[in-house]
Design a protein with these regions (language model features):
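Intracellular loop-helix junctions on the cytosolic face of multi-pass helical membrane proteins
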Residues: 79, 83, 87, 115-128, ...
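C-terminal transmembrane helical hairpin of 12-TM major facilitator-type secondary transporters
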Residues: 477-525
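Helix-loop boundary and gating motifs at the non-cytosolic
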Residues: 1-41, 407-412, 416-436
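C-terminal ends and interior cores of transmembrane alpha-helices
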Residues: 62, 66-83, 484-502
């Protein structure tokens, strides 16, 4: 059930971004329109009373699963159309509303179908399967689309990029024209050189930026891709930075009293190399050949920074299409990566992928239609006239805010993860930033190993263990240990910021410890939301709790990056530790039944 809950979310948030990028949609349009897909999950508490008042949660679950499957099939059918972007965005938006409604019903069904101690025992399993869905969506679906794409179109062309520590810096020459003779053989992609060697000596950032700008202008003038950003568009930093005279005075105060003693100046960038691509002969008139460059294997510290998608036709087939590869400035050893240039049928690949997704959801619909139980408590709570419905609708909201000690409960929801909400935004930048800037200077590949492998495994383990121990001794017994453990992350990263260890296994262990603590401690938070939602309208009230949960994560994360830039990593992690205090103060005011969450057999022994 929770695997099915996670798939639509990852489709809307991640998979759609990759799909549109592969189809040549500009970054500006992707960022703007896919951001709107998040809206239904933000505002879902507004219609949660409808799910609680009308029909059963079981019916809502199977109906929305069927609807999601139909909408995913609709996406697959509209991808080949000329205006696919407009059609698919509209359908995905409807899918997002259906998925948010499915979330409301699934959470309510979980609380109605399980005893209190079972809810505690399975809360870790629930979150684990949700995360498995996230991993499957971001991995398996994208791999499937890539395999189909690679099996169609022109034969793929592989490029090998190698970092060479002993290679001297070489000036990058950009060809203006190519002397290409049309081949009588089959249409193929030609890449020169087939093996690109890049020295590991960092170059001037200004020089690298200048070359990248020239490459983009060349590709634009030769018609290989459209401009993605207007010259007057503001950077994300300009848009996100707080403004105003009082804010500037606050910045000056923080920088003067809490900022790092000396701001590191980072004026070096990873070295780059250029590969030229063209076709072996002109394609048929009117045919466009979209060549997509992507990593096939190798070290993630070598990346493609320009020329991801190049469109050839009979007018530019023999002009130089330029692809730029860059190595991580922290990379000092010989590594290699293989990139593959493919020209498969991108739309066909993603159509098939979405048909597979649709089949998965139709299968889930059939499975849950026959397998899901019929809890006696799962019954509609409203009937009669529209006037009575409106009365019930507003009564649901009123009942939530009329609960005993609701102010303390809401404060706990907002403050429990105040420290973690700030920390999670800066973990990856801290791991990646140069040591001169206060970070750990890891390569992209190593961050993926530390955070994406060891961290995820520890997170799942913490969630499973947290659910188990609460089912044995109850939420009240484990609340304070979980509060302490979830806030270990601040101490972990404070240690890393001051010591800046060179040992990669030590860094991996520290990241795993922080993620384990987060998974273990978050179990208490989820159980407390279930406790607050107890009562007549638990489905709608749980949805309201998740709304406050989202707010508690969103607001602190908005200013955390701004604050870190002012005071540096060391003082930022000290600040994170200080922000654990409000949550602890509110936690001391909570009134929790000692038996809540405890398995009945365990409670009977006492």
């Amino acid at each position: 059930l929770y695997f099915a809950q996670g798939i639509p979310y990852v489709v809307a948030m991640s998979v759609s971004v990759i799909m549109y990028k592969r189809m040549g949609i500009s970054n500006t349009d992707i960022a703007l329109y896919t951001s709107w897909l998040y809206l239904p999950w933000v505002i879902k508490p507004l219609w949660s009373p409808l799910v609680d008042l009308f029909r059963t949660k079981r019916l809502w679950i199977v109906t929305t699963q069927f609807l999601i499957g139909a909408l995913l099939a609709s996406v697959a059918l509209t991808i080949p159309l000329p205006k696919f972007f407009q059609y698919t965005i509209a359908i995905l938006w409807l899918m997002a509303f259906s998925s948010a409604t499915h979330d409301i019903a699934a959470d309510g069904f979980y609380m109605l179908g399980l005893e209190q101690h079972q809810q505690a025992a399975f809360v870790g399993v629930r979150s684990t399967f949700y995360r498995i869905a996230m991993i499957s969506g971001q991995g398996v679906l994208v791999v499937l689309a890539g395999l189909i794409e690679g099996a169609s179109g022109l034969p793929p062309r592989e490029l090998q990029v190698v970092s060479k520590p002993d290679a001297p810096p070489v000036a990058v020459a950009l060809p203006g024209t190519l002397d290409v003779v049309s081949s009588d053989g089959p249409l193929e992609i030609v890449a020169e050189p087939a093996i690109l060697e890049i020295g590991t000596v960092a170059q001037s950032k200004q020089e690298i930026d200048s070359i990248l700008a020239k490459v983009k202008r060349t590709n634009l003038s030769n018609g290989f891709y459209p401009a993605e950003q207007s010259p007057g568009e503001k950077s994300s930093r300009q848009l996100s930075r707080p403004t105003g005279g009082s804010v500037e005075r606050l910045e000056e105060f923080l920088r003067a009293h809490f900022g790092p003693k000396e701001k590191a100046s980072i004026d070096r960038a990873g070295n780059i190399g250029v590969v030229t691509l063209h076709l072996s002969r002109p394609p048929e008139p009117g045919r466009k050949v979209a060549v997509v460059l992507d990593r096939a294997s190798g070290d993630a510290s070598i990346r493609l920074v320009e020329g991801m998608r190049l469109v050839f036709d009979d007018g530019n087939w023999n002009k130089p299409a330029l692809a730029v590869f860059q190595i991580d400035p922290t990379l000092k050893t010989e590594e290699q990566a293989v990139f593959r240039a493919t020209s498969g049928n991108v739309r066909l690949a993603w159509s098939v992928t979405f048909f597979v997704l649709a089949a998965i959801f139709i299968t889930a619909f059939v499975y849950h239609y026959f397998i899901l139980p019929y809890p006696a408590a799962d019954a509609p709570r409203s009937g009669g006239t529209s006037g009575r419905f409106l009365t019930e609708f507003f009564r649901v909201f009123a009942a939530f805010f009329a609960k005993k000690r609701i102010v303390v409960a809401v404060a706990f929801l907002l403050l429990y993860r105040l420290a973690e909400a700030q920390l999670v935004k800066l973990i990856s930048p801290f791991l990646l930033d140069a040591r001169e800037a206060g970070g750990l200077g890891l390569t992209t590949a190593r961050v993926g190993i530390a955070y994406g492998t060891f961290g995820v495994a520890a997170l799942m383990g913490g969630g499973l263990l947290g659910g188990y121990v609460i089912s044995r001794q109850g939420l009240k017994f484990w609340l304070w240990p979980m509060i302490i453990i979830i806030n270990l992350g601040g101490w972990v990263y404070l240690f890393l910021a001051y010591v800046q260890p060179q040992s990669f296994p030590l860094i991996c262990a520290a990241v795993a410890l922080e993620q384990f603590g987060y998974g273990f401690g978050f179990t208490a938070y989820m159980l407390y939301m279930i406790l607050i939602a107890e009562g007549e309208h638990k489905t709608a009230h749980y949805a309201l709790c998740t709304g406050f949960m989202a707010l508690g994560m969103m607001l602190p994360g908005m200013f955390s990056g701004w604050l870190q830039e002012l005071i540096g990593y060391q003082h930022f992690f000290i600040w994170v530790l200080l922000t654990t205090i409000p949550g602890m103060v509110v936690a001391a005011m909570l009134k929790i039944d000692p038996e809540f969450g405890r398995k009945k057999a365990e409670a009977a022994k006492r």
